[in-house]
């Protein structure tokens, strides 16, 4: 019950931090993308930009990565929010097994090897592969 209350409070805080935020997608800041107002949360529906570098992960892991300041995108500087990939990213070739490895690494406070992620990400939308 306390965990659910924490989730609700975190989400409510994120929504209150910027009235321009969409309610259904929460992600963190990355180069080339616009944040919503003054908050550090990036909103994107992943429909119109093939260069998006991150997406939402389950909220518990998202919060944990943020608290541990784990940046999984090499282009981030130390003062920017951590970047995490999502389960739905399997559609671009990022398998659920790799997602579990990624999530476990976040929980343990480690940075996994994302070589395969970047390779597959560059092929996203390519139907001839």
What are the language-model segments listed below?
Residues 1-2, 22:
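N-terminal hydrophobic targeting signals that begin at the initiator methionine
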Residues 3-11:
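Sec-dependent signal peptide recognition
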Residues 34-38, 60-63, 89-92:
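Solvent-exposed loop/turn segments at secondary-structure junctions
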Residues 17-20:
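C-terminal motif of bacterial Sec signal peptides marking the signal peptidase cleavage site
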Residues 86-126:
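Non-catalytic, surface beta->alpha helical segment in thiol-disulfide oxidoreductase systems
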Residues 58-79, 103-111:
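Thioredoxin-like thiol-disulfide oxidoreductase module
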Residues 22-50:
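Local sequence-structure signature of Cys/Sec-based thiol-disulfide redox active-site neighborhoods
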